[in-house]
């Protein structure tokens, strides 16, 4: 669904166009941007530029800061690991946001994900599942990142270990992720794509001018 914002001259503009103009700094558009952030959470969409614009407006207008919207923005950034979206969002947080206990917990979760300590991540999430369920597709987005890490780290992995990394999923969910990543079950192990197949040779060409080579040739005479 396309969101529109109303300009001072009465004209309407798609929110994506507004974000490319100076109007992105107009606090009168904040409510529309916040509604767009909430829609992302409901419909499993993601628009980093809109979310950054929202945080920037909070910076310029601290009295308008909304913690609930802040939570959504940070959680959506988590779903886009391993990209650096979360770092960008964190850099725009106000002291009032940084001192909030829930924001601190989300930042801690980001740190855990960055360290790839997935079992600890899921144990923290399990303490308050409804909070994360507000973000449609949150769990699957994290599992996609888990599979990304597994795919570049292992040639084979014990099935039960993978189950734990994915958040203690059942057999059906496990098989779905194995199939999605073109892995294969082999008894108690999961065979991941052969690493040699992912290694690409790199050709390096260095140009050496004759002027640079002449002194060396002279020394060899």
From Swiss-Prot:
InterPro entries: ARM-type_fold, CSN8_PSD8_EIF3K, eIF3k, PCI_dom, Transl_init_fac_sub12_N_euk, WH-like_DNA-bd_sf, WH_DNA-bd_sf. This is Eukaryotic translation initiation factor 3 subunit K. One of its GO terms (biological process) is regulation of translational initiation. Component of the eukaryotic translation initiation factor 3 (eIF-3) complex, which is involved in protein synthesis of a specialized repertoire of mRNAs and, together with other initiation factors, stimulates binding of mRNA and methionyl-tRNAi to the 40S ribosome. The eIF-3 complex specifically targets and initiates translation of a subset of mRNAs involved in cell proliferation. Residues 46-207 form the PCI domain. Its main location: cytoplasm. Belongs to the eIF-3 subunit K family. It holds the Pfam family CSN8_PSD8_EIF3K. One of its GO terms (cellular component) is eukaryotic 48S preinitiation complex. Component of the eukaryotic translation initiation factor 3 (eIF-3) complex. GO terms for molecular function: ribosome binding; RNA binding; translation initiation factor activity. HAMAP family: eIF3k (MF_03010). It is found in: Cytoplasm. Keywords: Cytoplasm, Initiation factor, Protein biosynthesis.
């Amino acid at each position: 669904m396309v969101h529109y914002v109303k300009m001072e001259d009465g004209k309407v503009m798609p929110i994506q166009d507004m974000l490319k103009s100076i109007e992105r700094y107009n606090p009168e558009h904040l409510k529309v941007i916040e509604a767009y952030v909430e829609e992302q959470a409901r419909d499993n969409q993601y628009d980093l530029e809109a979310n950054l614009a929202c945080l920037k407006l909070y910076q310029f207008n601290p009295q308008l800061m909304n913690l609930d919207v802040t939570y959504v923005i940070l959680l959506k950034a988590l779903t886009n690991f391993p990209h650096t979206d979360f770092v960008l969002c964190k850099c725009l947080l106000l002291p009032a946001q940084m001192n909030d206990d829930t924001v601190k917990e989300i930042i801690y979760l980001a740190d855990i994900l960055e360290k790839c300590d997935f079992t600890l991540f899921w144990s923290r999430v399990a303490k308050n599942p409804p909070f994360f369920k507000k973000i449609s597709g949150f769990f699957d987005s994290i599992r996609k990142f888990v599979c990304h890490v597994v795919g570049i780290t292992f040639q084979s992995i014990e099935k039960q270990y993978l189950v734990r990394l994915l958040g203690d999923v059942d057999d059906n969910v496990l098989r779905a992720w194995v199939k999605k990543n073109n892995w294969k079950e082999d008894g108690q192990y999961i065979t991941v794509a052969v690493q040699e197949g992912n290694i690409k040779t790199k050709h390096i060409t260095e140009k050496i001018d004759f002027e640079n080579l002449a002194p060396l040739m002279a020394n060899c005479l």
